[in-house]
């Protein structure tokens, strides 16, 4: 069962982007972007999110990192945890 739906992720992105003036991405448990302030990124793979899922910790990406990792930009990627399980990743650039 997927706890983090595209509808929920889109609402989180919209509300967070309004308050932070930052680009926000939400990725599912496979590292696929399911919601983004930058709509053209939806449906693409985010390698930074995959690193978060593998390491089970926050990952900060530099310009150098984003040059070699598919679908990334410099910023921070944090796990979304629900009932002690990572259900997705939020990225802020």
Where are these regions (language model features)?
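Hydrophobic, helix-rich cores of sensory/ligand-binding and other regulatory modules
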Residues: 1-93
């Amino acid at each position: 069962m997927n706890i983090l739906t595209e509808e929920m992720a889109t609402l989180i992105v919209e509300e967070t982007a309004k308050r932070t003036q930052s680009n926000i991405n939400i990725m599912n448990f496979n590292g696929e972007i399911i919601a983004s302030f930058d709509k053209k990124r939806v449906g693409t793979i985010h390698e930074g999110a995959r690193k978060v899922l593998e390491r089970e910790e926050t990952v900060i990406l530099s310009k150098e990192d984003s040059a070699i990792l598919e679908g990334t930009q410099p910023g921070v990627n944090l796990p979304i945890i629900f009932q002690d399980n990572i259900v997705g990743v939020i990225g802020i650039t």
